[in-house]
Amino acid sequence: MLKLLVFMQINSNIGLVLEGGGMRGVFTSGVLDAFMKHDVFFRYIVGVSAGACNGLSYMSRQPRRAKISNIDMLAKYDYIGLRHLVTQGCILDPELLYNKFPYEIVPFDYDTYFANIRRGDVFEIVTTNCLTGRSEYLQERDGNSHRLNELARATSSLPYVCKIVDIGGQPMLDGGIADSIPIERAIATGHSKNVVICTRNKGWRDKGKDHKQPRFVYRNYPRLRVLLSRRLKFYNEQLDMVDRLEAENSILVIRPEKEIVVGRMEKDIRKLENLYEEGVVLGNRFIKEHLSKLTAPY
């Protein structure tokens, strides 16, 4: 159903950047639900992996849809697990998530999504091109619902545990491999100020070590292997950039304040509910503290 809303427009030079993080993305869905409750909508959004998937329901103006998909339906359908890797080549159930959910079980409002696109809103989905080893920032502006679903699938296809997804003849995987927090993309597209929703606590860094990928791993994609071999270092550098830009007042960051206890493939419903609710609380607080700086009458 097409929904026409009257709202306060975020200034056009301010973008919204959505980090991924698997099931930690329920925090992002909580923040975005708070934004929708107050009719606060950004005109430019760039999202990665779970961030992009949650952002789709924000662009379609469907409060709680992402929460229902990520938490309520997880308890019912158990769509994370090795059995899906064996039967469908992905640790997440792609047929359920990118076909049955949007078309049948938790219907996605394609009419409203594409109406917002036609009026000039931009929603970029980050994927990693396995041939080039570079990030790509893809859109679906022509009303093709199947392609939009495939973009969501591609940006969420984790290396090693998900099949490569073909997008227009190009092999794609999770956008977080090449660009986990696409602030530089938002700046490059003319957005001098940005709001960034992160899914890690302030100060967190990955303490693991990068390892050179053996040749038998993605043997047809040597540039992807190189990228995977230095992924942790690059992600930590992006977190450093977030802190630096935040200190310079170039960006506003919304991130969990309580210690994160939700894993990438978390299935504990109580933990997920708590993180979602924290997102709602911090989203409401952000609006109260910062909305006047970001909006103009629309």
Language-model features and meaning:
Residues M1-V48, L56-Y298:
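Patatin-like phospholipase
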